[in-house]
Amino acid sequence: KRPKMVNSSQFAEMYNEAYRSSGEGKNFYDETALSKYASGEDPDLYPDVDWLDELYKDYAFSQRINLGVSGGGNIAKYYISGAFYNEGGMFKTDSMNEYDTSTYFRRYNFRSNVDVKLHRTTTLNVNLSSVFEKLNGSGSNSDTAGAGAGTIWKYAYICAPNAFPVRFSDGKFSGPSTNEGHNPYNLLTQSGYYERFWNNAQSLIGLTQDFSELITPGLTANVKLSFDAQNYNWIRRKKQVQTFTASKRDEEGNIIYTEGNVGQDNLDYSKGNTGYTTTYIEASVNYNRTFGKHSVGALFLYNQKQKNKTGVDKAEDALPYRHQGIAGRVTYAYYDRYFIEGNFGYNGSENFSPGHRFGFFPSVAAGWLVSNEKFWEPISHVIDMLKIKGSYGEVGNDQIGGNRRFIYNATVIDSGSYDFGKTAHTEKGLRVGDWANPNVGWERAKKMNAGVEISFFNALKIQADY
């Protein structure tokens, strides 16, 4: 709900009171001004503007539409869905504009999941999705993050109701007499427009093979390939409107104007875009099997990722970002009471020289489900679950240079100048920007965790970790 703002008559009365209290001993606004603010007979020289009412609607609409279809049989199953979301803004517009300054956000979603049974033991999964978004608004904002709503909101609240009219009666645009401040109506409706677009397309193809019949029960293999593409771009068509201030009327009753900001008829044009594509490959072999009271599991996984950026400024950012690694896990459980797990990761990063590119990161974990022990049965109706667990391992970080890549290479940049030769011709100088460090490698950290999980009456669960 919008707050109720004072009108010009109330503002002038309170301003006079504050002016007198400051030690001036007289009113800032004379009786003529107070009378005209109260009567509203000359809105050009004595305006009375509720800026919130001039800029904001009483309500805004939003719509959401979803549609989904699913089906299939023994061989193939599918699910397809689409969605549309539209959120209108609270700002008003000028119907005389030849461009759209209205504030709104729109999003379109699409998703398709298809599972195909290629063979009794072979399954193919194809998942596709895409999102498209558009944001529209005023061109008054100077950054790329939004459409000027914060700036307009600010001046709508700090602009006095008697500062100047929304617009003069002869059609001229009003504004402050100094460079400080803005007419919020001009910011909203006369400063051009801004459009921001964002889209993201994702695809994932997976193939799963069950080797339970061919080799041994519990053995499966999985291959995944994903491709993601994201793009963000914006355009701004911006202008500055010609503004005037009114000081008085001449003998014939015409307003005497003082020119404020110099305007322009054309719309400036600026744009920007960024984006990236990511390709990810993963292959894994899984084994899970139970032998009486013993349960064993194992996983071996290979992964590779490449990311390409667009709309970058630095040459090194235009090169692909690449990571590669393998991981493994072995698990064992006895009688659903005692658990042990070992993991390792062997990961490679392009940020380091070939001799330091890969790092090995092991970990181990163990747990005891005390509530599954026979001696726990007498109190199991009170404490139905108690588990003690702990883990220890190493983790690594390859982003140790901030935004810098290829730490093993030095960078050279322009720096200063020097005179050379008999004619003392000036040449540009060079210096090392970032020094090379061929011996740097993964940042390593040791992690330890000990914890307890407990459940009372099958209702209250508490978990504590250190």
Language-model features, listed with the residues they occupy:
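Extracellular/periplasmic, surface-exposed regions of secreted and cell-surface proteins
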Residues: Y59, N113-T121, N127-F132, N141, ...
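Active-site-proximal polar cores
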Residues: T243
